[in-house]
Amino acid sequence: MSQYVLHGINDVEVEVEIDMSDYDFQVKYELAFEKMAEEEKALQKVGKNSEITKGYCEMFNHLFDNILGKGISKQLFAGRYNALTTDRVYDEFLGICSAQVKSNTAERDKIINKYRPNRAQRRSSK
């Protein structure tokens, strides 16, 4: 697992483990997003802004807790519901995951290509 820092409310730094190439992490990631999709369907979309914001933030709190471990959302947000901070942390998290997937893919391709003959070399040998 790789250690990363997410920046929560009041610039608090929370160290988390993210490993997009690890099976157990992938399972937690996938299940958490499936649960989030269900929560989003039930999310109140009309009414008081304060209630909408609270529901929105709670949905992401559950996502972070389900992927990164119970209590992570409390560390990140200190029990507060701020939609902009939630969006920033989510963006930071997805950025880390995306960069890791790209890096893992590039490394895997490098390893595979090391043992795969070059297409041009195969053609010239015919």
What are these language model-derived features?
Residues 62-66, 70-79:
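Mid-chain, well-packed structural core segment of small domains
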Residues 42-45, 49-66:
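Negatively charged, Asp/Glu-rich surface segments that serve as flexible interaction/assembly modules
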